[in-house]
Regions:
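Membrane engagement elements in two modes
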Residues: 1-50, 59, 155-172
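Short N-terminal helix-initiation segments at or just after the protein's N-terminus
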Residues: 2-17, 58-65, 80-84, 140-146
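The feature marks short-to-medium sequence segments in extracytoplasmic or secretory-pathway proteins
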Residues: 47, 57-58, 71-117, 121-122, ...
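Short, well-ordered beta-strand segments enriched in hydrophobic/aromatic residues
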Residues: 64-72
Length: 172
């Protein structure tokens, strides 16, 4: 009961989250290291379909593709799904990560490898019409031991991130 009262009192005065987040701005074409990957975000574009993939045209939807070069600086394969955090785009749905060279789907990137990728989201056409630019966060990570005794190490997001604003080209 006492613990509950302490938590309620703490929440009333701003909660337990006192971590100061550190934001590192970067620009298109600049490298940003999140600890696991070195990321270079090149450009963003809206298209009706993703050629070479299973991204066929969908009524009322467009694809937002963000072209990125990624280098895995770690010693283990890294997952790609949550690598880019697309902000403030209503109704967005992550569609996948694809190799730029051939459109093949990619889920992980091995240690020491570099790949030019397209991260794609489906966005409602109504929201896409007003997209002049998009804000993307890349969360810094640390390689840490998991809490369970038999668990291995894992890349975990920290409270710090890099942030980039990328102009969006309309569909041609």
């Amino acid at each position: 009961m006492a613990l509950l009262l302490i938590l309620v009192a703490t929440a009333a005065f701003g909660g337990l989250d006192t971590v100061d987040k550190q934001v590192t701005p970067f620009k298109p074409g600049e490298e940003f290291s999140d600890g696991e990957y070195t990321v270079t975000i090149e450009r963003a574009r809206l298209v009706d379909e993703l050629k070479g993939t299973h991204g066929s045209p969908k009524p009322g939807k467009l694809y937002l593709g963000v072209v990125t070069t990624l280098r895995n600086d770690g010693t283990v394969p890294g997952r790609l799904r949550d690598q880019l955090d697309l902000r403030d785009v209503p109704g967005k749905e992550f569609f996948g990560a694809f190799r730029f060279r051939d459109g093949s789907s990619i889920q992980t990137l091995g240690p020491g490898l570099t790949e030019q990728l397209v991260f794609a989201w489906q966005v409602p056409e109504a929201a896409a019409q007003s997209l002049q630019e998009v804000t993307i966060r890349v969360w810094k990570k640390k390689f840490t031991q998991l809490m369970v005794a038999y668990g291995g190490k894992e890349w975990i997001d920290t409270d710090n991130y890099g942030q980039i604003v990328v102009p969006v080209k309309g569909s041609a």
